[in-house]
Amino acid sequence: MERKERLRAGIAAMGLDILETAQDRLLAYVDLLKKWNKTYNLTALRDEEKMIVHHLLDSLTLLPYIEGAQTMLDVGSGGGQPGIPAAVCRPDVQITLLDANTKKTAFLQQAVIELGLDNVRVVSGRVEAVSDVRADVITSRAFAELADFVSWTGHLLKDGGYWAAMKGVYPQGEIDRLPQDVCVEKVQRLDVPGLDAERHIAILRKR
């Protein structure tokens, strides 16, 4: 199966409706990851098929959880997941990609330019030191324990906003260690076509 068909089949299996032009741009993003990986150490994956599953389809599981959002912050964005795939598919959402690694933010800037993502801003720095970002949704993928995630980013969350933390196995221990002023709205298991591993998303809000 060629890569375009593999991506299309995965998107269909997830019940998502993504324009053909956006799918082409997602594959262009994979090309950029492959091109710059040796220089910037963006991903341990080298196989394109695995990149499509782990970096595209896995990131796209976020889309139903940012419905209605106008602004999103992707913390510890690294090589741009889930922020860049989300930005490609949701051009109506203003997305900030934040990472403390300057090599990775240099790549993110390049990717934003080459992919023509007018709705994306890249910020380099530690999240605790950032003050000029406010978001309806703050997301991360394998960034930090939930308690640290909400503690470090709470000042950047808009009133009425929420966190959407992408996790592997059900994070019961992390949930138990959350501060009293944060409540768990839901933890949903995610099905990623072609990925033989558990995935969950935790939706959290301030009390």
Swiss-Prot record:
Where does the UniProt annotation locate this protein? Cytoplasm
Which one of the record's GO molecular function terms can you name? Answer: rRNA (guanine-N7-)-methyltransferase activity
Q: What is its main location?
A: cytoplasm
GO cellular component labels = cytosol
Q: Tell me, what's a Pfam family for it?
A: GidB
Binding, S-adenosyl-L-methionine: 76, 81, 127-128, 141
Keywords, ordered alphabetically: Cytoplasm, Methyltransferase, rRNA processing, S-adenosyl-L-methionine, Transferase
Catalytic reaction equation(s) = guanosine(527) in 16S rRNA + S-adenosyl-L-methionine = N(7)-methylguanosine(527) in 16S rRNA + S-adenosyl-L-homocysteine
Q: What is its EC number?
A: 2.1.1.170
Kindly give the CDD domains that the UniProt entry links to this protein: AdoMet_MTases (cd02440)
Report if keyword Transferase is assigned.
Answer: yes
Q: Is this entry keyworded Transmembrane?
A: no
What is the protein's known function? Answer: Specifically methylates the N7 position of guanine in position 527 of 16S rRNA.
HAMAP family according to UniProt: 16SrRNA_methyltr_G
Q: Which family does the UniProt entry place this protein in?
A: Belongs to the methyltransferase superfamily. RNA methyltransferase RsmG family.
* The name this protein goes by in its record: Ribosomal RNA small subunit methyltransferase G
Gene that encodes the chain: rsmG
